[in-house]
Amino acid sequence: MKRLFLLSVLCLLVLGISAQTAKEEIFADVHRSAANYYAYPAVTAVQTVPPVGYKPFYLSHYARHGSRFLIDPDDYEQPLEVMREADRNGVLTGLGKKTLCVLDSMSRMAKGRYGELTPLGARQHRGIAERMYKNFPEIFKGQVEIDARSTVVIRCILSMMAECNQLQALNPKLRFKNDASYHDMYYMNFSGDPHIKEMRKSPEVKAAKEAIRKEHIHPERLMKTLFANTDYLKWKVDAGELMTSLFDVASNMQSHDTGLELYSLFTKEECYDLWQLSNRGWYISFGPSPLTKGEMPSVEANLLENILNTADTCVVRKDSYATLRFGHESCLLPLACLLELDDCGYQTDDLDKLDAIWRNYKIFPMAGNIQFVFYRKKGSDDILVKVLLNERETKLPVKSDVAPYYHWKDVELYYRNKLEALRK
């Protein structure tokens, strides 16, 4: 008994040590502060062995496109022009001049490629495909059919092709059906709910976001390192806007194979502060925040219904099958919240405590993905499923005696009931 007690205490201590706060995680790797620009992290998770006799036979996923260029030309040009004008007026420090050079290089690199997939983004999806093939070989064996669909955006189409080409290289016998059509956009990238749009622009949301900006944007130290003239800085530069613009460029530079960087402009504390701005913003506008009545994830009801309906047609097939979908983080994050994967559905009015539980970089990095993997056993009609978030097993809001595997009938019933409640 004493030995068991000591072992329990030791386990608790290990768990306490291993459970890092968001601040500690960002201080350990500032790239996490990039939020939705965070490059897909290395996968080290081990897959739990399924119950005896169960084999995977169907995989259904929704993946975000891989790493990309920033979308809007102004993302590069606005901070660049601020620094150019300051240079023309002779008020940049040495670090300011160096920053100008880096911004100019990034602007030229991005010209004509705004929003496009980078080579790293393609590699991310090839890696995901290779691990799917390795982890679930039974699904991709022989002349299996794979239905792969993308939104109509080029970076998503190229992400789809990268993943499919890698699977084809691993098994040339695989048969693919690829599509990217406006016909499927009602569930692949739905954005037509006026109620959701109105809630995101409500006075309460605007006030909350403005308060968050005031709390977490502190540009004074950074500006002093870039500008030698405080009067010029005061009258000619929107310091807060420049700081966040520089941080966006710095954050997304991990999407490229380049030795250039701007993260060194920021202290780790500033990186954490600016990430909180992003984390809270995404939580309010796309997550289950009480400020938006927890309704934001419902925007992905069509996508969840498609996942359920498609699964119903595939689990009765005798052969294996895969359904691959490629879209955006603005769909992936609310889908994870709608599914209540792990703590994605966490709700709190206290935003100061939000990042103790809810951290956006764990949900939707570049190439982020949700995989439903279905298992069956010969002689049994009890289908099992597990759900992976970025290739890591998750906890579902359903009871199970074989977790992280769940009985499909229980999972489907839970989500069907949830969809029905949303549409009343």
Listing of model-derived features with the role each one plays in the protein:
Residues 1-23:
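Bacterial Sec-dependent N-terminal signal peptides
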Residues 20-122, 126-147, 151-323, 327-424:
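Signature for phosphate-centric chemistry
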